[in-house]
Amino acid sequence: MSGGYELQRTDARGEGVFATRSFQVGETVMVGVIEAELDHNHAHASQLSEKRFVLHGGLIAKVNHSCEPNCGIHLNASGAHDFVARQPITAGQEITFDYAMRNYTVEHFAAHCQCGSPRCRDRITGWKDLPSERKADYRGFVAPYLTDIDNQDATERAGSPRTDRAGVASPDRPDPQRRRRGDRVSKSRRLLEATSMA
């Protein structure tokens, strides 16, 4: 036992992490520590940015998914994910989080979700596939880059270029303003050429 939680067997989902004391809403339940950098997404990967995947050390990697989780995610100073209570947790209760709180896409769980929650989505999905009301419910308890991607996508749909946090247009996505300026210059050149030929 360590820090208010321990590993136990569950009835249907193998091992899980269970609280050995109570936790209040907003209280840090587990502190994340990055154990290794990964080159791709998989069942135990935590996504820290659009292209960065890591493996968390300790029992945090054993926390099971739930479509109605009692924990969410906050980034700590090292960039790892801490698990924070989003509901009161009592001693003996399983500590859970939604895998969509840390990964934009989840494609490695083909079987049906086994969380047993009344709000079960039937399959484990990533943030990208969450309904908007669930995203709103999780606000403040997800990896920040997930909401950054949503904001960027909304900006793109509105016709603005995709930018990084500093507001710089991404090189792989052309700036529509630059394209429009180029179109105006080309049109001006054609008019000038037509006038000079007349």
What are these regions (language model features)?
Residues M1-A198:
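Conserved catalytic SET/PR domain of SAM-dependent protein methyltransferases, capturing the structural core
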